């Protein structure tokens, strides 16, 4: 059985004061879908953090986690290079989404090992 290589780029974040999920999610979906449409990512998901009594005390403060799934590191690296070029479409989508997020967002990259 051939294993599928998966790479996940995730961001943990909170919305700026006064910004609702309802107004934010369409902008986030448009930004994440762009990476699929461009052929970099294969899927995405957006999760809302739920409190778990007695756990998570050492984690940074965040409300949401967005995850873009790539088939391999090469596609993830290509997507990162694409963003660094500051093209008009990706920059516009990023600014529209990012303007609603608190500035303390953080990001991490994971590769599936099992």
Please report, for each region that a protein language model flagged, where it lies by residue.
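Secondary-structure boundary/capping signal
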Residues: 40-43, 74, 105
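A broad, low-specificity signal for short, low-complexity segments enriched in glycine/proline
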Residues: 4-7, 24-31, 69
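Prokaryotic Sec-type signal peptides and long signal-anchor helices
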Residues: 28, 35, 74, 111-112
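Short, well-ordered beta-strand segments in beta-rich or mixed alpha/beta enzyme
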Residues: 6-14, 45-85
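Short amphipathic alpha-helical segments
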Residues: 19-47, 86-93
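Alpha-helical interaction segments
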Residues: 13-15, 34-35, 53, 97-98
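Glycine-rich beta-strand-turn "strand-cap" elements at beta-sheet edges
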Residues: 1-3, 45-62, 88-114
């Amino acid at each position: 059985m051939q294993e599928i290589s998966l790479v996940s780029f995730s961001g943990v974040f909170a919305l700026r004061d006064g910004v609702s999920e309802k107004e934010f999610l369409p902008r986030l979906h448009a930004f994440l879908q762009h990476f699929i449409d461009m052929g970099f990512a294969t899927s995405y998901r957006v999760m809302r953090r739920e409190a778990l009594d007695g756990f998570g005390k050492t984690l940074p403060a965040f409300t949401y986690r967005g995850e873009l799934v790539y088939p391999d590191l090469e596609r993830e690296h290509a997507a990162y290079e694409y963003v660094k070029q500051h093209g008009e479409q990706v920059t516009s989508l990023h600014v529209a989404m990012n303007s609603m997020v608190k500035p303390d967002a953080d990001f991490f990259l994971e590769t599936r090992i099992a």
